[in-house]
Amino acid sequence: MSQPVQRAAARSFLQKYINKETLKYIFTTHFWGPVSNFGIPIAAIYDLKKDPTLISGPMTFALVTYSGVFMKYALSVSPKNYLLFGCHLINETAQLAQGYRFLKYTYFTTDEEKKALDKEWKEKEKTGKQ
């Protein structure tokens, strides 16, 4: 690409994405709240690989409820906060998966299967693989 074309492309990009409105949005809680809140779904996704005995049923239920409420809130405020909605949608999905794992292990796994799973998780813990 020639230099004038590169300059024109850069100028176009800057005018479109780096303007007063974008900067104004980036410096608001509408942006930084959801960005900082992404730690919860990231942790939930990471925990999907961990031992199901570590899952807290009440906490998982609380986080499912919390994410559901805030998804509704994100679409109820004006202007709609799609970043917050996306954060809680990801968290809702991860927490529902954790809830499934909790219910499956706690209520639908026989004692023999639990012993085998516990042995498997202890082996993984020893080798450091998860």
From Swiss-Prot:
One Pfam family here: MPC
GO BP: any one term: mitochondrial pyruvate transmembrane transport
An annotated GO cellular component: mitochondrial inner membrane
InterPro entries membership: MPC
Other comment: Present with 396 molecules/cell in log phase SD medium.
SUBUNIT field: The functional 150 kDa pyruvate import complex is a heteromer of MPC1 and either MPC2 or MPC3.
UniProt protein name: Mitochondrial pyruvate carrier 1
Organism encoding this protein: Saccharomyces cerevisiae (strain ATCC 204508 / S288c)
